């Protein structure tokens, strides 16, 4: 079934007439992979090599030599892997689950390694948004209301207040730093919409759904290309700049998908599917997501894991056409097979490190936590898809 047919079957007129990605010939692994065991190994490697277990926060390099001063927003994605593991094992391994719950408490006590404030506020809007999303996941996993309260307070006081109307239209500004406040970025608006949607999910306050729609409408009408499904990086001085990145494709998919679930408007689903198709067909080489980083010690090494997180939710949604879901699941599975069998040297466990290029193992230079988080996110996703 083509993507056009899949959407037409939902009674949608405005369809995407693109080619579906077909990874079916790439699904054979060189050996049988136990994804739960693989995820356990990836989680332990992340925690043992990169976490300060007295603080629950993560250091940039495995040997502790890197400067952690600006190591903030990635903390959210690293803790998300711990939450993934917690949710997977809490009913079967109470002792380890309790340890992971303690790490969440410590992470919160130290404000996710926030380098500029005793709370979660930050000059960069997207940095706070990722922290808020992780706090909400911690609340969802544990029921600890303090996490939700901090998430709500941070969003209400320091995120949605950065919505401005200027020559770029609306949109959340990227940063309050001088010279950066004129930039409206996909990286601040995609996660911003997700924050509002998740707060609506757990508070049922209509203002959050209204704000999510507002943020998403700006993003969709400016940086999103409805013909291709690509999401540009930013708009500055009324001019669109920068090409698509897996970070922005992923958060656009996530916010569109959640809006579809909350409203039933199939336009959101169409846009989510288009964005996913663009990633699979135009941002991959031989079926493997492109490496968007020039080095392992780069925030770009986190980007692929962001796409994986939100594409996984889309692939798991049983209300969406089964052929599309299989396509997306197979794409991620192919990436995971190559990453786990070719892109990591497991001979020195737990000193095993993912590379930012999932097709080749790391070298000693690559012992940074950003690619480790993306790799572990991918492997954890396999435990949900299989």
PLM feature spans:
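CBM-like carbohydrate-recognition segments
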Residues: 26-81, 85-126, 161, 184, ...
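Residue-level detector of extended alpha-helical repeat arrays and alpha-solenoid scaffolds
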Residues: 75, 128-131, 148, 189, ...
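Short coil/turn linking the two alpha-helices of tandem helical-hairpin repeats
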Residues: 86, 90, 139-143, 200-204, ...
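Extended ligand-binding groove/face enriched in aromatic
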Residues: 97-202, 206-213
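Active-site cradle of extracellular carbohydrate-active enzymes
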Residues: 189, 196-200, 208-259
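Oxyanion-binding "anion nests"
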Residues: 250-263, 267-284
């Amino acid at each position: 079934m083509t993507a056009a047919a899949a959407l037409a079957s939902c009674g949608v007129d405005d369809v995407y007439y693109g080619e579906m990605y077909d990874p079916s010939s790439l699904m054979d692994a060189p050996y049988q992979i136990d994804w739960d065991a693989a995820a356990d190994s990836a989680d332990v490697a992340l925690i043992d090599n990169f976490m300060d277990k007295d603080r629950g926060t993560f250091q940039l390099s495995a040997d502790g030599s890197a400067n952690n001063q600006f190591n903030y927003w990635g903390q959210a994605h690293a803790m998300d892997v711990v939450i993934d593991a917690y949710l997977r094992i809490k009913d079967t391994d109470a002792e380890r689950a309790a340890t992971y719950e303690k790490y969440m408490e410590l992470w919160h006590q130290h404000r996710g390694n926030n380098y500029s404030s005793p709370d979660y506020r930050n000059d960069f809007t997207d940095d706070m948004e990722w922290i808020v999303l992780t706090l909400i996941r911690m609340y969802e996993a544990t029921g600890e209301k303090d996490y939700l309260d901090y998430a709500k307070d941070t969003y209400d006081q320091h995120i949605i207040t950065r919505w401005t109307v200027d020559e770029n239209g609306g949109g959340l500004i990227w940063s309050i730093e001088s010279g950066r406040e004129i930039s409206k970025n996909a990286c601040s608006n995609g996660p911003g919409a997700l924050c509002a949607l998740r707060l609506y999910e757990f508070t049922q306050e209509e203002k959050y759904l209204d704000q999510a729609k507002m943020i998403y409408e700006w993003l969709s009408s400016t940086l999103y290309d409805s013909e291709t499904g690509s999401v540009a990086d930013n708009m500055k001085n009324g001019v669109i700049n920068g090409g698509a990145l897996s970070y922005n494709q992923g958060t656009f998919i996530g916010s569109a998908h959640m809006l579809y679930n909350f409203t039933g408007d199939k336009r959101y689903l169409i846009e989510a599917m288009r964005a996913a198709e663009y990633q699979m067909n135009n941002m991959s080489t031989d079926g493997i997501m492109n490496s968007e980083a020039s080095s392992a010690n780069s925030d770009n090494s986190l980007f692929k894991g962001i796409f994986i997180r939100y594409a996984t939710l889309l692939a798991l949604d049983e209300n969406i056409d089964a052929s599309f879901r299989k396509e997306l699941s197979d794409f991620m599975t192919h990436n995971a097979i190559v990453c786990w069998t070719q892109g990591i040297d497991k001979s020195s466990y737990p000193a095993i490190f993912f590379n930012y290029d999932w097709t080749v193992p790391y070298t000693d230079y690559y012992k940074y936590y950003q690619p480790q988080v993306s790799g572990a996110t991918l492997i954890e996703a396999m435990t949900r898809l299989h």
